[in-house]
């Protein structure tokens, strides 16, 4: 018989089903995750340690090695001394790590002498080892590159290369190409070649003794440039002209290379209009002496016997065999240079994620440029765009209300993201002036506060700064450039910004009830105000005048005015069906003060109805066809089509502060092309 003490225990041990009791699974409690010693990290420790080591270096405390930097040609004991810490130099610089830890002779010496670096550059690099900061300028960048290349300081070397690439211009591009070639920096060499190709026409006319020109390149460097498909030239004459320039700069030394140089000229792309130029080319002494057979063979292959005989009255029959042999490559019909297919086109900008359309309004040719925002994460945060175009036809795109800034290089058909802007805005505008991007106007997307701050971006430095603020806030306005000044204009006021004095000046206002669009043409501001009224501002006279009204067509919902080459175009659209735009293009006749319908062959354009336009020089051979954006009126919109919700909101009027509902069109910001 069980006792009372045993009974409960036996009942507890018994399984409910009569079998063995399952084993108890022991799971860790919450406290088990927090056992053991606490581990803390001082986030300021590394910076404080580096700062303390720098203070020791400055005070020459605890230094265990002295680096003597001797000027080339000088003897030991005449150089500049740098007391340093071995551990710091070895930790920051692979060159010194090998020196001090690899069993080299210098690892046991209290003093080390260096000959292949200048003292100023070494001082900057030692400071970098202690601080992680480096100061670059036009005066020291090439010497710093050479020193950092020797000391294997990769960050400084690449920073110097990036600095040089951002400062490429007509006066230094050939020197930078030679510099990159000397150090074997492929990326910088490619960037210099691309700049030369893009500006080849201008460079072909440069010959100042104070500048390095294409004639200063080595043979290998010149051949690499002349073989580029990406040369931005309208005629092969320019390429031939540069080849002759290079040969004539040193005829005795370079003359024997004439045949090799002229092989880079694509003779198949000369036309009958080039006959006078070719006749003059054949009379040049260096051509007669070194490569007459090469050019004669090329001309005979290009023009045939009839025209060839008119160009070369007395052909050198003895050289015909060598000509045909030396010009085998010319018979392969090489492609045209990139610049030969360049066209000034009207660019349509619509929804931020849609491709941008490049259109020739006269021929109806249509191409598309991918938007850089298509694959951007959180694209719903981008509602509109602000776009401007530089004199070099680079397209700068600012997303709203985000802080993104992008640049499109037409010759490379590629987008590059630049440094983020300082402020988030919506309703802003953007303009390019003398190497700077200006962004102003609009309001804070969160608080709705109108912004007077003006952001300025330095293209060469890839940096932003705030300049003189606006005297008054701007919404629903245009920002334009005339000569060296910015003009901000809306229906009630206009201000002019002078960058040389960093100040805003008040101008004669438009004083109209409405403001639609404005652009610069012949150094005057053409403005569509109360439709169909159009007025023109002359900045020299500081006065407005009214011109003939724009054409007024019923159901037109979009008016855009742009400078297209040497013409002023008015582009209007009406929307007979959802997201289908019937586009009409008018050209302004200055003498008759009237708008002429050019009868564009564009049909229905399936594109955002609130598009805006700019004009730029692009390269159709680099672009994809855009015919898929043309449609017929009777077609039914695809079920897969999606209408993007830009989010309706009301916007306080810039002038009165009253609240009014705005259409989507008010969110699109435009800048007239230069």
Swiss-Prot record:
Subunit architecture: Core component of a BCR3 (BTB-CUL3-RBX1) E3 ubiquitin ligase complex, also named Cul3-RING ubiquitin ligase complex CUL3(KBTBD6/7), composed of CUL3, RBX1, KBTBD6 and KBTBD7. Interacts with GABARAP; the interaction is direct and is required for the ubiquitination of TIAM1. Interacts with GABARAPL1, GABARAPL2 and MAP1LC3B; the interaction is direct.
Ranges for region Disordered: 1-28, 631-674
Compartment annotation: Cytoplasm; Nucleus
Biased composition (Basic residues): 10-27
Coiled coil: none
Pathway assigned to this chain's UniProt record: Protein modification; protein ubiquitination
Record's comment describing the protein's domains: The ATG8 interaction motif (AIM) mediates interaction with proteins of the ATG8 family including GABARAP.
Residues of the BTB domain: 63-138
Pfam family, one: KBTB_W-LIR
Protein's UniProt name: Kelch repeat and BTB domain-containing protein 6
Mapped Kelch repeat ranges: 386-435, 436-484, 486-523, 524-564, 567-616, 642-673
